[in-house]
Structure formats: C-alpha cells, structure tokens
Amino acid sequence: MEKLIIQGGQPLVGDVHIEGAKNAVLPIMAAALLASKGPVELTNVPILSDVFMMQDVLKSLDARVKFDEQRNYLMIDANQPLNFEAAFEYVSKMRASIVVMGPLLARLGHARVAMPGGCAIGSRPVDLHLKGFEALGATITQSHGYIEAKADQLVGANIYLDFPSVGATQNIMMAATLAKGTTVIENVAREPEIVDLANVLNKMGAKVFGAGTEEIRIEGVTELKGTEHSIVQDRIEAGTFMIAAAATKGNVLVEEAISEHNKPLLSKLAEMGAQVIEEENGIRIIGPDELKPSNIKTLPYPGFPTDMQAQMTALQLMAHGTSVMTETVFENRFMHLEELRRMNADYQIEGQSVILYGPPELTGAEVAASDLRAAAALVIAGLVANGETLVTNLQYMDRGYYHFHQKLRALGAHISRADFDEAGHRKTTQKLA
C-alpha cells in the first residue's frame, strides 16, 4: 500500500505549474466520438488516472486513441464504425464516463452505458441526463445495471434543468449538436469547463451559443469533424495550491492562474487575511501569520465550488475563531472531517453545515482519503500539523492531481510517497521527479 508521508511545519515558497483541467478534458474526450471526419487532437492534457480510464472507455467503443504523455498530447480518431456499448468494466470505475452517452446517442442513435461509479460523494443521480435525452426524442430503458437510449433521429427541444448539473449540461449539449432543429437548454451549468467543451464543439462544426450563461442554444448540424484544442487550466488544482500557500504561511505564485475562474475563492482567501496579488504571469498567495474565520456556502458556478469545499474546511480549521461551511451541492461531502478529527480538528456538523472551531493544535496521524478532494484536504492539514502525517487511499488523489507531492516538495514541503508492506513497514520512497 502506498502512503504519503508528511512532516508538517514548512511554509510553501516558489512557483507552481498548473495542469489542464480534469473536469474539462474528460467530456471533451467523449465529444471526440461525434467527429465522423478527422481526428480530435488535444494538448495540455493532464496525466491522470481518470484520463487513462476514459481512454480505455473510448477504446472499448472502437475509437483509436494515442496518448503522448511527454507532450501532454492526446489524439482521438472516431472516424470508423463505433461500438454503442460502454462496458461495466470501465464505466463502473469512473462517474464521468456517463458523458459518452450523449455523443453515442447522437452519432449512432443507440447508446448502452453501465451505471457510473467513481468518488463516493452522495447519490449524484443521472436523472437529469436521461430526461434531457427523452426530451430530444430518445427512448430510455434501465436494466441489469445498464442504461440504454435509442432514437432514430434526435429532434431539438426546449429543456429546463431542475438543477444546473455540469454533467447533464455537457451530455445534453453534445447530444443536441447532431439533432434536427434547435435545442434550448435553460438553467444550465455555467462552469469554465462548459465553455471549454462548447469551444471544442464549435471548432468541430457545431453551432453552440450561450455557453457560460444560464441558457445554451444549439442548432443541430448533420456532421462534425476533427479539430485541435488546448485544454483550459484546472481551476481546482490552482485553488488547492492557493489554499495550501495560505495554510502554511507561504508565498506561492500559481502560474497562469485565471482570476475570473476563482473569484469566490480569492475573495474568501483575502477575507481570511491572505494577500492575493495578481501578477503578469499568475496569482501570488501570501499566507497571513493569523487566519481570520469565514462563513462559506458552496453553490453552482459562479458561486464557491463544491470541489474546493474539503480543502477550504481544512483552512477554516486553522483560523482564529469559529467558521461555518455550508454544502448545498452534494450530500455526504463532509466525510474528510472524521479523518481530520484524528488530527485534533474540532467541529460540529448540523445538517448541511459544519461549524469549525479554530485554531486546533493539529497533530500528525494516519488518515485515509474518502475521495479526490478529501485527499487534498488531508494533505493540506498534514502540511501544517505537528509531527508526521500518513495519508492513504492515494488512488483518489491520483485521479485529479498530477505529481502532487513532487510539486509540493519543490515548494519546500517535507513530503514523500512510499510503499508499505502489510505489516506497515516502509519499503521504498519515490524520488522527486
């Protein structure tokens, strides 16, 4: 079993490079299935386990995929006949793979996709995806752990999402690109990753208007072709390093960070006493000697992102005073707090909110990540805690952070990754790449 070993107490200092966005590249990879002429070529592709899993999903659908990790380059060729079934073997491991359903339905008129898996955060139902497909004229059946959608011809429709779901917005938008007529989707997600997907689709020949607003209009076309595209920067990775800098009283330049994508986080960091400095080549965060408490509520974009909630609660615990975090997007997203309690965190959960009493004297402990962002929160706490912290379940971390511990170590953290045997003895320690 691999574990991160962290000796806390070191401020993070230096510059950090941020990868392409995981939450952008996965649906864009799925969108490549829509191209019946020419390959889709992507650059700034993050090297993450989720990207490899999506690559396996696409290959199982008979797309040709080439991933050059040295260049962060990914080529997807879906010009040949495709398989309509995304098997349980792949889809069950990663929730985001449900986004192949819209492209398959649009391209083939038939999609059969295993119920998705991935991080254990709430129920995350796919009902909104399916209602959208039905509105476009598809027939939906569910049996034996699979969802099946069929349509002789998708037809444009007016669709209202009960909640601005990112995945549903992406899936319906992709399905509508080849539908007959015009589709209008209201109350859509507005995330930068939605805009990035729309940009790719339009480069492929689609007619998508309004991405980034509350309403998206898609005028259907008869075919889409390959294109080239560079993946937008990962605002969640950028935000994670910003929080880590503030937590450790550090001084970190997050290279090429896009302030427009992180407004709520930057506002809260400043409110808590951090210096937020926009420079020509990025955003610099300088942590304060004493953090101030804050009250935060997660909301769909452009509100405070739920994917930053776990990391931010770790920071709130370090503030001098009482802070509150309210989670409105997903249920069961406070699971990391039980692990932080092992490090001496003091808090009280009340419904959708958690009251965080700071600052505790955080002490190192062995803790287990329950999901991707929980892993980041535990690492941030370990960077500040007295003594040694061991973080396990690193497979979650690898889904969304590339060379996380190497980047932290380059900033001055005392952190390494090692393999342990069943008796708990350390076997090897990975060197800084």
Curated annotation (Swiss-Prot):
EC category: transferase
Record-listed E.C. numbers: 2.5.1.7
Pathway: Cell wall biogenesis; peptidoglycan biosynthesis
Listed InterPro entries: Enolpyruvate_Tfrase_dom (IPR001986), Enolpyruvate_Tfrase_sf (IPR036968), MurA_subfamily (IPR050068), RNA3'P_cycl/enolpyr_Trfase_a/b (IPR013792), UDP_GlcNAc_COvinyl_MurA (IPR005750)
Sites where the protein binds phosphoenolpyruvate: K22, N23
GO molecular function: UDP-N-acetylglucosamine 1-carboxyvinyltransferase activity
Signal peptide location: none
Subcellular location: Cytoplasm
Catalytic activity as recorded in UniProt: phosphoenolpyruvate + UDP-N-acetyl-alpha-D-glucosamine = UDP-N-acetyl-3-O-(1-carboxyvinyl)-alpha-D-glucosamine + phosphate
CC annotations in GO: cytoplasm
Binding positions for UDP-N-acetyl-alpha-D-glucosamine per the UniProt entry: R95, R124, P125, V126, D127, L128, D307, V329
Record's keyword terms, sorted: Cell cycle, Cell division, Cell shape, Cell wall biogenesis/degradation, Cytoplasm, Peptidoglycan synthesis, Pyruvate, Transferase
Entry function: Cell wall formation. Adds enolpyruvyl to UDP-N-acetylglucosamine.
Family membership: Belongs to the EPSP synthase family. MurA subfamily.
Protein name: UDP-N-acetylglucosamine 1-carboxyvinyltransferase 1
Native source species: Latilactobacillus sakei subsp. sakei (strain 23K) (Lactobacillus sakei subsp. sakei)
